Amino acid sequence: MNLFYDIEVYPFDAFVVFKDIDKNSKLFHDKNGFEGLAEFIKGHTLIGYNNYFYDDHILAKMLQGWSAAQLKELNDLIIGGNRPKAYNYPFKSLDTFQQIDVAMPGLKKIEGNMGKMILESSVPFDLPRPMKRDEYKEAVAYCAYDVDMT
């Protein structure tokens, strides 16, 4: 079965949202060490947007139990252009970004071209403290929307 997914990383919070074709969702968070994540994705094909260049690297470290702070360091390296070398991850994934034209549009541009709402989060990715409950809910909703658009 295919699972669509997206990851968000903040200095004190990191999580991944999965959805199946019927939009059933599952959230894994660093606060519980991503407990159950490996078992949940076992045998599934993961589908993301630009995941070959970002999410797959982060997900591999989530599976190793990295903390939000460690994931944020990796996140910043990747965003800064220092992408880790790809290796054989313990999961199978497909990247919908690879099916897009060479202009390399971002997911938000594609959403706009499809006439979809462009949802942004007001929670800054460099938030210098743990998220408040309402910020966490907003960030998860933002992540889940990106999974839907993938």
Predicted features by range, described:
Residues E8, E35, E39, E73, ...:
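Glutamate identity and glutamate-enriched acidic tracts
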Residues N2, D20-K109:
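Conserved DEDDh/DEDDy metal-dependent 3′-5′ exonuclease domain
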